[in-house]
Amino acid sequence: MTSFDPARLLIAAACIAVMASPTPAQAGVGDLLVAPTRIVLNGSRGTQIILNNIGDDVATYRISLELRRMTPDGSLVDVPAPSEAEKAAEAMILYAPRKITLPPNQPQTINIAARAPAGLADGEYRVHLLFRAIHAPRPVTAAATTAAKGISFALTPVYGVTIPVIVRLGNLQAKAGIANVHLVREGGKPAVAFDLTRSGSRSTFGEIRVMKAGIKDPIAIQRGIAIYTELTQRSIAIPVDDKLAAAATGPVTVQYVETTEMGPEVLAETAAVLR
């Protein structure tokens, strides 16, 4: 007969559910808002991250670094065996504080910077900063201590949100391309699917716009599309705006637009015919 192991349930209670908002200005999980949701450090100059508790109760969060890799579908997965570059990225990031308690509607700043060791090769280095909620311990009640049969456990999810922290050393360049544009259906609704490619020494980050002649607004748009340096290609499908679904046929132009200090820059553009 299989033995009952309560430790496994306790381990399950510590699992982290990681969520990210599609809005580039802020990310939120539970009652925590984080802004910005993407940090790029060029050289040794640091920056700040703003955290805000929009809930009604005091909340505590632990802040830590994680290594993650992007898969071709855009998912981020844990890194079981870090490369030397990933180890260097983790070692060079400095941040404080590492634990915060936020009263309701009281923002707080996190200071973050990078200190690259002498002799480190030029390139792009990336870690992910995790903000994980710490639940206050609950008092043990009489009802919880008197179980008629066996042992019962209440699993409390522990939520967190991550943001990428990118360090760029040297004069890094990147090129992008769009290929294999075609129409698909997702959940019974039209979507524009394509392959997004990247080459060069840095990642890319921007928004995809699907434009149709004679229509002012994009018939499909998605912000916050990244291709990190571990990938050269991603497969993407963007839902067509419900109000413009009838226009999802015939000639279109697909753009990948990156926001830079000088303004929007078109990284890639292609014409296609949707059928």
Predicted regions and their residues:
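Beta-sheet-dominated interaction scaffolds and their linkers
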Residues: 27-57, 99, 175-189, 197
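Short acidic, flexible loop segments centered on an aromatic residue
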Residues: 56-57, 61-87, 132, 197, ...
